[in-house]
Amino acid sequence: MNTHSAISELIAPWLELTDPKLAALVITHLELDSRLIKSGDTFVAIQGHAVDGRQFIDKAIAQGANLVLAEADAQHLNGWVEYRAGVPVIYLAELGQHLSELAGRLYGGHHNQLIGVTGTNGKTTITQLIAQWLELLGHKAAVMGTTGNGFLNALEPAANTTGNALQIQATLRDLAERGAQYTALETSSHGLVQGRVKKLHFVAGVFSNLSRDHLDYHGTMEAYAAAKFSLFSEHACQNAIINVDDAVGAQWVKQLPQAIGVSLVTKPNTAQAIWAREVAYAESGITLNFESSWGEGELHAPLIGEFNACNLLLALATLLSLGFEKSALLATAPKLRPVLGRMELFQREQKAKMVVDYAHTPDALEKALRALRVHCAGQLWAIVGCGGDRDRGKRPMMAAIAEQFADRVILTDDNPRSESPQAIVADMVAGLTYPERAHIEHHRFQAASYALQHAGAQDIILLAGKGHEDYQVLANETIHYSDRETAQQLLELQP
């Protein structure tokens, strides 16, 4: 990536440097993590949510940083400059609040058009459907989110759904230099609240739904909803595409007069809209007859589940809002493919079907089980766990949903982290009406094996919670584990 800027230009909005030698220093790369510093990098030291980066200034310099930008405090006021081992450290007030703009001034200036997708569930599917559709229409498109960053056939792993502000701007610049005309970003509530996408300009923003998640961070559903809404209210967002079947979305469109409403149920009362007249679900996919501000049509795509019908409509509305032809979109829709680890079907004759899905919230689990019930001629199995060191309140809810919408329930582990797996499952069992009917097997592979051994050929087994993930986080280690590989191995399928 070929980027460079004089420090005086980069920090001009916040500080004027009077030392000409210092002002002429050139920045080529910004880095928040001292462990990743390479020779010539600029270390950005801020007061983080968990760690104070200023504690690692000396380490970053030892690693080769040629300049440090540090968050000002009572001891080091805005504009204060000190030298450590001959390396200048410049202190800036509220540096953490300016990261997105700072990175944009270094990495910006590209023509990569950005689409932000927010919501509790569906972000990964919607971003990847949009990117797939754009590629089918001849436009090079990338994604950034849970399953990785980059082009769909070569995603690079990402640590978080929404990376830090510096990573996002640098990645967008890199993708643009590699030919990306569009990038669809999953914009998490954490990323929005922490200002990681603050200075990005979105040609479209999409809201999928809101249900219980991340309350260990946000505290209340109201705060969680406000975080999501900020994509439309506090960020540069040209088009707002809102699922009005969601109660929160129905309220939001009243505050967004130019919003595009999307519904599987009824015609939205919005300036522009798209809504389903009839939806047919089959194992071969979804057929959706719709009306819209762009005319009526019929869409067929090889995805399953009511929520995927909604995801398809949201993706379609997004691309229509950007000026793409309806006829071209409908003609290419049958070539869309399910997303890795999202309602992904594994099957073999005379065996129960196994479906891997990322559903790890009560709402997502219910939707996944409801979707599979339509296709299940036998018994529906749910293999479900809950993460450790996360929202304990949803554990009994997850178990209750599994009991209500599945015929057979197996409680298992899903990244127990530092917590006791037995304690996590005990929290889940508290939500069961008939706990004696549930089977407990902490090892996920053994849980899936048990289900397949006891399931009939007409049964469907849902492995919920991990989706694309290929690891299990335990107390002191992270081990390799994949539900997808488990399904392939148990059904003796070629990977």
Swiss-Prot record:
<dbReference type="GO" id="GO:0051301">
    <property type="term" value="P:cell division"/>
</dbReference>
<dbReference type="InterPro" id="IPR005761">
    <property type="entry name" value="UDP-N-AcMur-Glu-dNH2Pim_ligase"/>
</dbReference>
<dbReference type="Pfam" id="PF02875">
    <property type="entry name" value="Mur_ligase_C"/>
</dbReference>
<dbReference type="InterPro" id="IPR036565">
    <property type="entry name" value="Mur-like_cat_sf"/>
</dbReference>
<keyword id="KW-0961">Cell wall biogenesis/degradation</keyword>
<feature type="binding site">
    <location>
        <position position="465"/>
    </location>
    <ligand>
        <name>meso-2,6-diaminopimelate</name>
    </ligand>
</feature>
<feature type="binding site">
    <location>
        <begin position="119"/>
        <end position="125"/>
    </location>
    <ligand>
        <name>ATP</name>
    </ligand>
</feature>
<dbReference type="GO" id="GO:0005524">
    <property type="term" value="F:ATP binding"/>
</dbReference>
<feature type="binding site">
    <location>
        <begin position="414"/>
        <end position="417"/>
    </location>
    <ligand>
        <name>meso-2,6-diaminopimelate</name>
    </ligand>
</feature>
<feature type="binding site">
    <location>
        <position position="390"/>
    </location>
    <ligand>
        <name>meso-2,6-diaminopimelate</name>
    </ligand>
</feature>
<feature type="binding site">
    <location>
        <position position="194"/>
    </location>
    <ligand>
        <name>UDP-N-acetyl-alpha-D-muramoyl-L-alanyl-D-glutamate</name>
    </ligand>
</feature>
<keyword id="KW-0133">Cell shape</keyword>
<comment type="function">
    <text>Catalyzes the addition of meso-diaminopimelic acid to the nucleotide precursor UDP-N-acetylmuramoyl-L-alanyl-D-glutamate (UMAG) in the biosynthesis of bacterial cell-wall peptidoglycan.</text>
</comment>
<feature type="modified residue" description="N6-carboxylysine">
    <location>
        <position position="228"/>
    </location>
</feature>
<dbReference type="GO" id="GO:0071555">
    <property type="term" value="P:cell wall organization"/>
</dbReference>
<feature type="short sequence motif" description="Meso-diaminopimelate recognition motif">
    <location>
        <begin position="414"/>
        <end position="417"/>
    </location>
</feature>
<feature type="binding site">
    <location>
        <position position="34"/>
    </location>
    <ligand>
        <name>UDP-N-acetyl-alpha-D-muramoyl-L-alanyl-D-glutamate</name>
    </ligand>
</feature>
<keyword id="KW-0132">Cell division</keyword>
<dbReference type="InterPro" id="IPR004101">
    <property type="entry name" value="Mur_ligase_C"/>
</dbReference>
<dbReference type="GO" id="GO:0000287">
    <property type="term" value="F:magnesium ion binding"/>
</dbReference>
<comment type="similarity">
    <text>Belongs to the MurCDEF family. MurE subfamily.</text>
</comment>
<dbReference type="Pfam" id="PF01225">
    <property type="entry name" value="Mur_ligase"/>
</dbReference>
<feature type="binding site">
    <location>
        <position position="196"/>
    </location>
    <ligand>
        <name>UDP-N-acetyl-alpha-D-muramoyl-L-alanyl-D-glutamate</name>
    </ligand>
</feature>
<protein>
    <recommendedName>
        <fullName>UDP-N-acetylmuramoyl-L-alanyl-D-glutamate--2,6-diaminopimelate ligase</fullName>
        <ecNumber>6.3.2.13</ecNumber>
    </recommendedName>
</protein>
<feature type="binding site">
    <location>
        <position position="32"/>
    </location>
    <ligand>
        <name>UDP-N-acetyl-alpha-D-muramoyl-L-alanyl-D-glutamate</name>
    </ligand>
</feature>
<comment type="pathway">
    <text>Cell wall biogenesis; peptidoglycan biosynthesis.</text>
</comment>
<feature type="binding site">
    <location>
        <begin position="161"/>
        <end position="162"/>
    </location>
    <ligand>
        <name>UDP-N-acetyl-alpha-D-muramoyl-L-alanyl-D-glutamate</name>
    </ligand>
</feature>
<dbReference type="GO" id="GO:0009252">
    <property type="term" value="P:peptidoglycan biosynthetic process"/>
</dbReference>
<keyword id="KW-0963">Cytoplasm</keyword>
<keyword id="KW-0460">Magnesium</keyword>
<dbReference type="InterPro" id="IPR013221">
    <property type="entry name" value="Mur_ligase_cen"/>
</dbReference>
<dbReference type="GO" id="GO:0008765">
    <property type="term" value="F:UDP-N-acetylmuramoylalanyl-D-glutamate-2,6-diaminopimelate ligase activity"/>
</dbReference>
<dbReference type="GO" id="GO:0005737">
    <property type="term" value="C:cytoplasm"/>
</dbReference>
<dbReference type="InterPro" id="IPR000713">
    <property type="entry name" value="Mur_ligase_N"/>
</dbReference>
<keyword id="KW-0131">Cell cycle</keyword>
<keyword id="KW-0547">Nucleotide-binding</keyword>
<feature type="binding site">
    <location>
        <position position="188"/>
    </location>
    <ligand>
        <name>UDP-N-acetyl-alpha-D-muramoyl-L-alanyl-D-glutamate</name>
    </ligand>
</feature>
<dbReference type="GO" id="GO:0008360">
    <property type="term" value="P:regulation of cell shape"/>
</dbReference>
<keyword id="KW-0067">ATP-binding</keyword>
<feature type="binding site">
    <location>
        <position position="469"/>
    </location>
    <ligand>
        <name>meso-2,6-diaminopimelate</name>
    </ligand>
</feature>
<keyword id="KW-0573">Peptidoglycan synthesis</keyword>
<keyword id="KW-0436">Ligase</keyword>
